[in-house]
Regions:
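N-terminal cap/lid segment of alpha/beta-hydrolase-fold proteins
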Residues: 1-26, 265-268
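Short amphipathic alpha-helix adjacent to the substrate-entry channel of hydrolases
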Residues: 40-58
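Short glycine-enriched nucleophile-adjacent loop
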Residues: 99-110, 115
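Accessory cap/linker subdomain of secreted extracellular hydrolases
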Residues: 117-203
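C-terminal catalytic histidine-bearing segment of alpha/beta-hydrolase fold enzymes
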Residues: 191, 195, 214, 229, ...
Length: 276
């Protein structure tokens, strides 16, 4: 697959553009995976190319696994580049934290007319970093939000657990439940300690076009089913122009990728075993 790489220093955002072989005037900003050119990102490109869609993969930075004060201007610049390079219809898709980012960006930029949030939240929370620190793999960053705009952090729900208790709670719950990772208690306890305010809620009623929300009851990272139901209620209570579609599965965990995309992942994995 041919791509054009983008760097913060020269382009204002980190990502890669993958043009579809067919002549398409549609593009998706895909924030799937930890890096814009990693395994999951490339898989999402292959899947979207099969649908005849150009793809702009994006991530915070090369091998940057945290999310803190991510400037929405980066997505704004990516939209501008896509428009000047023949894309008339632009959508955005994200999963997990980037699902929340997709909703937030779409509520700011009306050029996004298809928004897909896979296991998103309906609010913005405190920024965090991943790596290694005092024996912890993840920790919250004081005074920082997940996202920022025009140099200011967006209002956010603070975590009630500070470093290192933040990670210890996740670690303890993961061990207790036997899950790969379990952070649901972290989010539930934080919302109990600090009920979500209107300023922290994503204004999904400002989203244009079509909004698709997908989650599962058995999500153990956070209660995305509750968050999606709150968004459904919000849309009923407020005037809006977008069309909302939502699906909540009973069993799908935190990773609710389409079956055909999962098949692409398996195919790619088998191919890599043969090639390498």
């Amino acid at each position: 697959m041919q791509k054009r790489h983008f760097e913060m220093e020269t382009d204002g955002f980190y990502g890669a553009y993958w043009k579809c072989k067919t002549d398409s005037d549609c593009a998706m900003i895909a924030m799937i995976g930890d890096d814009s050119e990693d395994y999951l990102a490339r898989t999402s490109v292959k899947w979207l190319h099969k649908l005849g869609v150009n793809v702009m993969t994006m991530s915070p930075a090369k091998k940057d696994y945290g999310h803190h004060n991510y400037p929405l201007e980066r997505i704004e610049k990516a939209i501008s580049w896509l428009k000047t390079h023949g894309n008339q219809k632009i959508g955005i898709v994200g999963a997990s934290t980037t699902g929340t980012l997709a909703l937030t960006a779409a509520s700011y930029f009306e050029d996004l007319t298809l928004t897909i949030g896979l296991t998103p939240s309906d609010f913005i929370w405190q920024g965090f970093m991943q790596g290694k620190k005092d024996g912890c793999k993840e920790w919250p960053i004081e005074g920082e939000s997940l996202f920022s705009y025009k140099g200011e952090p967006l209002p956010y729900m603070p975590f009630c657990y500070k470093h290192p208790d933040y990670w210890h709670v996740i670690e303890k719950e993961t061990k207790r439940t036997g899950d790969m990772i379990n952070s649901r208690k972290l989010f539930d306890d934080s919302e109990t300690a600090h009920p979500i305010t209107e300023e922290e809620i994503i204004k999904i009623e400002k989203i244009h076009g079509t909004l698709l929300l997908i989650g599962a009851e058995d999500d153990v990272l956070w209660d995305t089913a509750k968050y999606i139901r709150r968004m459904e209620l919000r849309m009923k209570e407020r005037p809006h122009t977008c069309r909302l579609e939502s699906v909540i599965y009973e069993h799908a965990t935190h990773f609710v990728f389409p079956e055909s995309m999962l098949e692409t992942i398996i195919e790619t994995d088998r191919l890599s075993e043969v090639v390498f």
